[in-house]
Amino acid sequence: SYADMMKNKELFDICAITGLILGEKAENTNYRNIAIMTDADHDGLGSIYPALLAFFSNWPELFEQGRIRFVKTPVIIAQIGKTQKWFYTVAEYEEVKDTLPKHSIRYIKGLGSLQRDEYKEMIQNPVYDVVKLPENWKELFEMLMGNDPELRKDWMLG
């Protein structure tokens, strides 16, 4: 119910900040887009899903309009002389590490691992991934989150 959802402090705060109102379309929000920023590790990425589910189940139009974005956060920062190169996945770094000039790397375990100037750079010049939905998103949502467990079982069992 609406009352139960508003008891969730995080969801309540998000609604208060963004101007989103449960039960209403996201038409008159305080911001054009909503950017989600978490640690790039498995824990941080795992925390995205409850937020996405809350947005998706209440305001799917935000996804249809490309208004939900992730702020990409670095996993590795390579120091090459006085310049830095940020990598958002280990695979991205592994792909080019042998072509980089002599460098040192620092693994970023979370946003708290960033130095103040790095954090400022990420806030002032964010790199976004826009969440895009497949055309059959309504069917998928109903299958995965709907009231018919047989649909989920069929999907999981292939």
Model-found features: residue ranges?
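Conserved phosphate-chemistry cores used by DNA topoisomerases
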Residues: 1-158
